[in-house]
Amino acid sequence: MQTEHWGSLPAEDDGGQLTPDKYVPTAAKKLKLDEIRQRGDPQPQEKHHKLELRSALVTQTIEVMKQTEVLQSLIETYSNKNGSSNYLLNPCLMIPEVDFPPENAAELVGSQKFQKPIWFTPTVDTAYSRGDPEAYPEIPSSACRQAMRKVMCGMLRLAGFTDCSESAVQLLTDATEEFLRSFIGEYRGYYDSQPRLQNSTVLQLVPLERAHFAQTGTSLTQVHNYYKHKVLARNRAEIAEFNSVLQEYDKLMKESQSSMQKQHNEFNGHDFLNILDNSATGSSQSIGGMAMGDMLQDLGGSTGSSGTVSSQQMLYGLLDGQISSNTSNMTGTSGNGSTGGNGNGNGATISNFHATFET
């Protein structure tokens, strides 16, 4: 009897031939490995989903409010308000141009719900139309708090607040979080009491109304009224104010451009060159006078230290050329000695110098 051992390899004759669909050829493996090397390291799968928190209507309202403030500050800087009109403070100063995106002031919500007649559109068979359940990404509590904080800041700005302390924002965020937690608890309580609604993925109006009344004592229609009268009406009012301020600024800018063009047309280049020539002549004369005055002051200071010689007579003599005929009478000595008179440190004879200029 033949003994079979556990883990023994079968002989070559025992197994059949491998078909091409049972193995991968070596050449194909090499091509696949080269392709993987070219791709680089495999990227890890993104398990976190980024949810953009954006309310187009509130965001547009805040952006339009900022643009209106910028235009009003420019108008106050370059113009002076007199009654109901604005006048330029300096006609020669060009007002800067502003370029705001036109979509910032676009009307996102029309006055009519349907602008065109309703026509029949055949449905497309999709998971959404069939009502198949969808796997929604799980949002952590930290992301929810951050989202509520951003929403609270936007609603405060929409309400008219420009500055708010950190503690006030935190207090309002905590109050909103507690309200939503209680509201969802009331809503889930109604679903738990109805067996047929436990697996429902669609929001029902009756549970929402009961949960809202349990928390606030008012109907759920107050949310619609708030959106209509506070959010939507504020958006339209801010857009209307921005358009009015923009027209006023455009009027001032056109007035500034026309004033600059008028000043340019009235400007005469020949007169400007004459002004430059006159200013250059006056400056050269003043420079020459200052240089002559400095020279005379230096000369006057040196003669005043000589003792008995009068500074005015010496200057007049220098200017008239009298000093050239009398230079032969002046003698100099080196060191501390002198010839025929009291010597000074420079070696010049004061007696001869004195006799030359006195008459």
From Swiss-Prot:
The entry's keywords: Nucleus, Transcription, Transcription regulation
Annotated InterPro entries: Histone-fold (IPR009072), SUPT7L (IPR039460)
Record's subcellular location: Nucleus
Keyword Transmembrane helix: no
UniProt entry tagged with the keyword ATP-binding: no
GO molecular function annotations of the record: protein heterodimerization activity; transcription coactivator activity
GO cellular component, one term: SAGA complex
CDD domains for this protein: HFD_SUPT7L
Subunit structure as annotated in this protein's UniProt entry: Component of the Spt-Ada-Gcn5 acetyltransferase (SAGA) complex consisting of wda/Taf5L, Saf6, Taf9, Taf10b, Taf12, Ada1, Spt3, Spt7, Spt20, Sf3b3, Sf3b5, Nipped-A/Tra1, a histone acetyltransferase (HAT) module made up of Gcn5, Ada2b (Isoform B), Ada3 and Sgf29, and a deubiquitinase (DUB) module made up of not/nonstop, Sgf11 and e(y)2 tethered to SAGA by Atxn7. Interacts with Ada2b; the interaction is direct.
Biological role: Component of the transcription regulatory complex SAGA, a multiprotein complex that activates transcription by remodeling chromatin and mediating histone acetylation and deubiquitination. The SAGA complex predominantly acetylates histone H3.
Descriptive protein name: SAGA complex subunit Spt7
Species of provenance: Drosophila melanogaster (Fruit fly)
